[in-house]
Amino acid sequence: MGVALRPLLAEYKESPGWDGLGGIAAVDAFNALYQFLSGIRQADGAPLMDGQGRITSHLSGLLFRNANLIEKNITPIYVFDGKPPVFKASTLSKRREVRENAADAWEKALKEGDEESARKYAMASSKIDAFIIDSSKELLSALGIAWIQAPEEGEAQSSFMTKNGDVTYAVSQDYDSLLFGAPDLVRNITVSGKKRIRGKVLSVYPERLRLEEVLTGLSVTQEELIQIALLIGTDYNSGVPGVGPKTAVKIVREGKFYDRIGESENAAEPDQLIGYFMDPPVERSYNIESRSPDPDRVIDLLCGEHGFTQERVEAGLERLGAKKGQATLDAWF
């Protein structure tokens, strides 16, 4: 997901360590939920499920990853996507096709007894539906963790809140937040700390990117960074064939963006896409106040409705409660 800016950003990444990340984090909810749904699975790739066959991997992730964040003096605020912009339709269609193909491959691998392939394809088949969204919001409310409904893109909303000074930084695995103007982006704090790549398990550490340092280092403006992304390709356009990150920077610096962007097949005019990144629809009135968890409500939801063991849930609640009072909004202003 997101734009392929990684090669241009490597030298601007900071490794702050957990001690340097205390504050209020505007978390891209869908991004985090996909991580939970893909990563929290059984050996054969099957997600955690309750007695009614409803997926619960995301609920486990929300309880224990948030406990981890709060123990590290990070106050998470979850921002949910709203209606996608019309020019994202092609990308969403392709993602659905990828998930469907992965689901078929998962089933085939299971029949063949190939557990490693089954898990890989199962992770790629993850999807977010109305139940996942509604149950996530319900659990977050019970945990006392604020959540916000964005009118369209969650990353745009998170970026707006960061620019506004209401949160310390935006959290997402994608780099789109920089295009939306987030002055501070943090990656890898809602993941488990381990990542499997080509069969190897690697450690994952927090990364931080500051927009001002990126723009200064690349000698571009915010609008020019967006132009670079459009030349490469984003969730909203296909990019120019044969143009990679370094070539895109060269084109923009030479003032030839409009000469080359016409070579791509786009559903929207480049100025419309630039305008969307610069001034996206956002909710300007929101409440990010965190509260103490409601243990009875959490236990009723997770244990009563979804079959979690009470001992496990109480352990998560204890971790949340132990630090909750230290991670309120007042601590950061």
Curated annotation (Swiss-Prot):
Binds 2 magnesium ions per subunit. They probably participate in the reaction catalyzed by the enzyme. May bind an additional third magnesium ion after substrate binding. It comes from the Archaea. Its EC number is 3.1.-.-. Residues 117-256 are annotated as: I-domain. GO terms for biological process: DNA repair; DNA replication, removal of RNA primer. It is an enzyme of class 3 (hydrolase). Gene3D superfamilies: 5' to 3' exonuclease, C-terminal subdomain (1.10.150.20), 5'-nuclease (3.40.50.1010). InterPro entries: 5-3_exonuclease_C_sf, Flap_endonuc, Flap_endonuc_arc, HhH2, PIN-like_dom_sf, XPG-I_dom, XPG/Rad2, XPG_CS. Residues 1-99 are annotated as: N-domain. The keyword Transcription does not apply. Its cofactor is Mg(2+). The keyword Mitochondrion does not apply. PROSITE patterns: XPG_1. Keywords: DNA damage, DNA repair, DNA replication, Endonuclease, Exonuclease, Hydrolase, Magnesium, Metal-binding, Nuclease. Structure-specific nuclease with 5'-flap endonuclease and 5'-3' exonuclease activities involved in DNA replication and repair. During DNA replication, cleaves the 5'-overhanging flap structure that is generated by displacement synthesis when DNA polymerase encounters the 5'-end of a downstream Okazaki fragment. Binds the unpaired 3'-DNA end and kinks the DNA to facilitate 5' cleavage specificity. Cleaves one nucleotide into the double-stranded DNA from the junction in flap DNA, leaving a nick for ligation. Also involved in the base excision repair (BER) pathway. Belongs to the XPG/RAD2 endonuclease family. FEN1 subfamily. HAMAP family: Fen. Interacts with PCNA. PCNA stimulates the nuclease activity without altering cleavage specificity. NCBIfam families: fen_arch. This is Flap endonuclease 1. It comes from Methanocorpusculum labreanum (strain ATCC 43576 / DSM 4855 / Z).
